[in-house]
């Protein structure tokens, strides 16, 4: 007889998908669940002694419980302040003909400067970096005076910056000995540019990134390093800072990053540049005062450390303390958080005295203008000063009736966006792994479909008709109910796609999981998962399985336990020391653990799991970038095997229909322009889709292609899809070994690789 595991029963009014209590029905959404996991990730940290903060080769966990609590308190204070400040909002004016002409002229002029800057910066990067002796010549403009001018970004000063760049581009750097191999050339250049970087060897494209950062610095410009995740943005930044330190520029330098990554920054600086001091500036007010007193004097000298701090501490101390330091360079890690134009960090950074800013982000830019404005404001703050004014440039709502056709309005928008892209071009560097990390094994992503079981179809029918509680009987727990917000209906439909036990266990209050045979038999995707794993384990593959729902991970944990499999697991409740232990165990070649269960948000960031060569996305995140970050846990530098990604989807369900629209940016995720207004669909103030719209999605007629693809995959096709020989090319010019296989068929479709984002071709 199959043993059963106890299941904790929580009143329905308190249930959410990650096991935490909720205060309203909307908290049952993946968004709220994942936000809580992110918060929990930052709170769940190990306790360490204060002096470890300065240990150059200490443990990777340097974040104490007190620091996490301080972070939480600062976050609450900031949220309260923002609520008070957001009492009212101004209405943006419409853009008339005169305004549009003026805007077009401004953008055209600024774009010309940007194109000129780009051309000359490329010359500098190719021909070499200005030598220190050239910088010291008295006839040239002094660094302090020139940098102050170049940072203003008005027309006159932009011309000065361009003129200075023309002068430098004519000065050839040292020629590299053509007899050297590519590796020897890279080593020689690294020793010249980054003499203090002694703890590792940069790759060729990373060294080019350092040279690009230096060219920005020499011209007083801000920049965005947007290399794809896993290409080493941290080490490129450290290499650049070591170049400045090695040339007598003592700083100070400030790194602002998420709390969970502070220890990684500290340890990477210690590893690659052991002669450079660094501190983690965090703790309560008294601890921060003590850190400043001991390590951050007003007079900056060679011993002044690189200061690493979190967003919350930076925002809290910007006006009162950090503004008194003349920061040479400020680095903002995970810079995509600045894409919200209302971000307080953007506002607080303006209080700091800083020569330049660098934003690091592995998330490509999306197709929305609000995000684009934030980046333009970050790069060119004196030109793009007002978000309301920027909004008005695209507000043609009053012109629809009289002055322009819809096509003309769209043409105007396209013209403006095209020019804005041109302005950003010189200031962003983005490389893809497929372009620069040629030694990285190839990756293939395949969507696999599973049809609903009769059990799931019956649940879906009851959900649509609001009769599920009655169907499950009198034992249903009352409280939250199922009638009400549409978002709640969408979530319940998605739960049914993932596994109907997510619904049944919540409603009937069952203490026990069903037998393993029922767990598999009740759900189409779980059947497909079992078929996949049998084949993968037979070929000794290690597998990462991602889901947004921690309760679904509970079901999987139970299933694997009953089957006798050893499992590792990370979600928002797992503390950092336990994470490190599990990652180490999973990465051990002798380990018997071949399965790693991870929640998409808590387990999709900041960890290296290249021991696995297979990633299964059991359910897809509303934000496709989260899934890309999850895939990159195993497809990154250090991977030696071809990687397969299997994205599971329930055929002809709300899951496939709504996600299809999310990916095409029509609903539920990205900022869109409609009716002349900006709407953030996931924002609390957004208007939810009407119930008839969601029900209409369920009733949509499938195309002939959909009917062909969205069905169960045969065993023969499954075996052919799991073959990876087409990803293995052992010699230059060798043809693919695997027989040609169609990109789609009954039960599957191969995802064609794409970099995504509106600026994906920026550095092509």
From Swiss-Prot:
Residues 528-695 form the Helicase C-terminal domain. InterPro entries: Helicase_ATP-bd, Helicase_C-like, HELLS_N, P-loop_NTPase, SNF2-like_sf, SNF2/RAD54-like_C, SNF2_N. The keyword Flavoprotein does not apply. A motif (DEAH box) lies at residues 333-336. A motif (Nuclear localization signal 1) lies at residues 145-152. One of its GO terms (cellular component) is nucleosome. The keyword Transport does not apply. It catalyses: ATP + H2O = ADP + phosphate + H(+). Keywords: ATP-binding, Coiled coil, DNA-binding, Helicase, Hydrolase, Nucleotide-binding, Nucleus, Repeat, Transcription, Transcription regulation. One of its GO terms (biological process) is chromatin remodeling. GO terms for molecular function: ATP binding; ATP hydrolysis activity; DNA binding; DNA helicase activity. Belongs to the SNF2/RAD54 helicase family. Interacts with the MBD domains of MBD2, MBD5 and MBD6. ATP-dependent DNA helicase that plays a role in formation, organization, stability and heritability of heterochromatin and thus regulates several physiological traits. Binds to the nucleosome and promotes chromatin remodeling in an ATP-dependent manner; induces nucleosome repositioning on a short DNA fragment, and, possibly, could be guided to target sites (including silent transposable elements) by small interfering RNAs (siRNAs). Can bind both free and nucleosomal DNA. This is ATP-dependent DNA helicase DDM1. It comes from Arabidopsis thaliana. The gene is DDM1.
